[in-house]
A protein has these predicted regions:
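Bacterial N-terminal signal peptides that target proteins for export
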Residues: 1-7
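Hydrophobic helical h-region of N-terminal Sec-dependent signal peptides
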Residues: 7-16
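Extracytoplasmic/periplasmic ligand-capture domains
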Residues: 17-24, 68, 84, 92, ...
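Active-site-proximal polar cores
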Residues: 562
């Protein structure tokens, strides 16, 4: 053998030896859990559903976010360099960005690193006003009074031309590469809440939107800790750590008496985020398969124990002994949400502000047995809702009582009799005052959990002599129909993204029809009070007007308030650091998984 051949053989042998002795890479840390409803897509301005926003909230980044451990809440900078500079009249907000933040790599950037700059947020906020985007959040941002944006929208609508993103507006502009200025028509003391929703107003890059025109929902590209790797619509979502994510370390501000929060802070402070490598989400709409998937360790987190299985998982509010022996972890919290039955105020049967239709809605509301819904399908995991103001919001009072939670079939029947909803032909069913059939239609979902509610509704309406039919469809189809006004009654929930009552109040605000006002309710007196409440600082004057709005909502009954939900989460022992966000959706980056369990899937 030649010297050269011998040397080559030795080199090959050494290389093989090194390969044989090289340590195996650490197992991938993957958070696995399931959504109970399908996502709709991943373009923030087009989204109105919680589950899609939960994904976008980890891909995109807003200027601010909610501290992970602080309770009830603390707003802290995300991409902003600090808190905003706010004028004394609360109409001018100046915000500086951290330099050196980059979007995830994408072909839309043509091979260059793309830094986040102030103009990206200008573009992001303009998109809410672009008629072509059809943002369900348009009215939420319109009512903030960002000067010039609504006029730019009107110009596009009247000219039938594309929205002009290049025209500067007074209300949102870049003063320099890293400084954003907002100017508002009226004082907005709580404007920072609108800047703290990564799932809604996280920065998007114009190049990405233009590169994937018409397919924006499929191509989310942000600056956040995760990026979309795989998506099978309504089935499976996989996200992976963004390799270009800047250095962000674990820091939070738990209350002094928060033992768990203090323990998480002591354990993780200074760790680089995210601490896990990937997130895999399955869409499992039926409760039993979702529960079994978790027990079979196909998921390591059960984000919301299905109500059907709370007696098995947490009997009497305590972790079941068989789960405790296996070191499972459980958390329980009252959600900042409200669950209600919307009435379509434009529907000829249940809509309208005339006395007869108001009486019909109030009678239906009095005839709905909320206590049965709580004790039955919900297995005690809810409390009756009195108003649209959710727990932990300004204006929420646990002792405040309205007619909304009353169950009084006798009074309901009396109201129906008084306003001419009578059984004229003796068949046991009421007719409308003009003699035409009275038939209600409830939109629902085709699974065992929702069918329990259908049975309660059918029984309750039969007790009143009212026919009820049910139309079942998947969640995204129902939401699409409801947003288009193609429904009569729909039962659904809404989780707060901020600690203000405004989100609940907006659900009956006339200008938000087509957005959050799914009931399509329009009452000038209510709208005038809403405008006042928006401009006032928190305090007695604002609370007094808020209460007047709630009285009007109770009187006209555009929705039947049902419950505020109690949420229960369950995790395998390898998951550490979890806490359900009180507001916002971000938690993936703050959790960790122990290596053995991360590899056990």
């Amino acid at each position: 053998m030649s010297l050269r051949a011998a040397a080559l053989a030795l080199l090959i042998g050494l290389t093989a030896c090194q390969r044989a002795t090289a340590p195996a890479p650490p197992p991938e840390k993957v958070l696995r859990y399931a959504f109970p409803a399908a996502e709709t897509g991943f373009d923030p301005p087009q989204l109105a559903d919680l589950y899609s926003r939960m994904v976008t909230g980890h891909i995109f980044e807003a200027l601010y976010r909610y501290d992970y451990l602080a309770r009830p809440f603390l707003v802290v900078p995300d991409t902003a360099a600090g808190l905003p500079e706010v004028s004394t009249d609360q109409r001018t907000w100046t915000i500086r960005l951290q330099p050196g933040i980059y979007f995830a790599d994408d072909p839309a950037f043509k091979g260059r690193k793309r830094e986040l700059v102030a103009e990206d947020y200008v573009y992001t906020f303009k998109r809410f006003f672009d008629p072509a985007v059809k943002s369900p959040l348009f009215n939420s941002y319109r009512q903030e009074g960002i000067l010039g944006l609504e006029a730019l929208r009107e110009r596009a609508l009247k000219s039938h031309r594309a929205f002009d993103y290049d025209t500067p507006v007074e209300g949102v502009r870049a003063l320099d590469r890293y400084t954003i200025l907002f100017r508002l028509a009226e004082p907005r003391p709580r404007f920072i809440f609108q800047l703290a929703s990564s799932g809604a107003c996280g920065a998007v890059a114009r190049e990405v939107i233009e590169a994937y025109r018409g397919h924006e929902m499929e191509h989310p590209v942000g600056t956040g800790p995760f990026m979309l790797e795989q998506w099978r619509r309504s089935s499976f979502i996989r996200l992976v750590r963004n390799p270009g994510y800047r250095t962000v370390t674990y820091d939070a501000h738990p209350n002094a008496d928060d033992a768990e929060g203090q323990a998480w802070l002591a354990r993780f402070k200074g760790r680089r985020l995210p601490m896990i490598d990937a997130v895999e989400i399955s869409i499992i709409e039926e409760n039993q398969p979702r529960w079994l998937s978790f027990l079979n360790h196909e998921a390591n987190l059960l984000y919301g124990i299905p109500e059907d299985f709370t007696p098995q998982a947490i009997p009497h509010g305590r972790l079941a002994p068989n789960l405790a022996r296996r070191h499972f972890q459980a958390w329980r919290a009252l959600a900042s949400d409200r669950y209600m039955a919307y009435f379509n105020m434009k529907d000829p049967v249940v809509g309208g502000l005339d006395p007869a239709h108001v009486a019909l809605r109030r009678a239906i509301s009095l005839g709905v047995d909320v206590a049965r819904q709580i004790s039955g399908p919900r297995h005690g995991q809810a409390i009756p809702a009195q108003t649209v103001v959710a727990p932990f919001n300004f204006g929420y009072d646990p002792d405040f009582k309205t007619e909304a939670s009353d169950f009084d079939p006798a009074r309901a029947n009396a109201l129906l009799d008084l306003y001419g909803y009578l059984d004229r032909d003796g068949d046991g069913w009421r007719e409308q005052p003009d003699g035409s059939p009275l038939v209600l239609e409830l939109r629902s979902q085709p699974d065992s959990f929702y069918r329990q509610f259908e049975e309660i509704w059918l029984r309750d309406m039969t007790r009143l002599g009212i026919r009820l039919t049910v139309r079942e469809a998947q969640w995204p189809e129902n939401l699409k129909a409801v947003r288009a006004g193609q429904y009569m009654i729909w039962q659904a929930g809404y989780t707060n993204a901020s600690p203000d009552a405004q989100i609940g109040l907006e659900q009956m605000y006339g200008p938000s029809i087509g957005g959050l006002n799914l009931a399509r309710f329009k009452l000038p007196a209510y709208d005038a009070l809403y405008d006042e409440v928006e401009a006032l600082p928190d305090g007695p004057e604002r609370l007094e007007r808020l209460r007047r709005m709630l009285q009007l909502a109770t009187a006209y009954a555009p929705m039947k308030l049902l419950v505020h939900r109690v949420v229960n989460d369950l995790a395998w022992p390898e998951l550490t650091g979890f806490r359900r966000p009180a507001f916002g959706v971000q938690f993936w980056e703050y959790i960790d998984l122990t290596a053995p369990a991360a590899a056990a899937h």
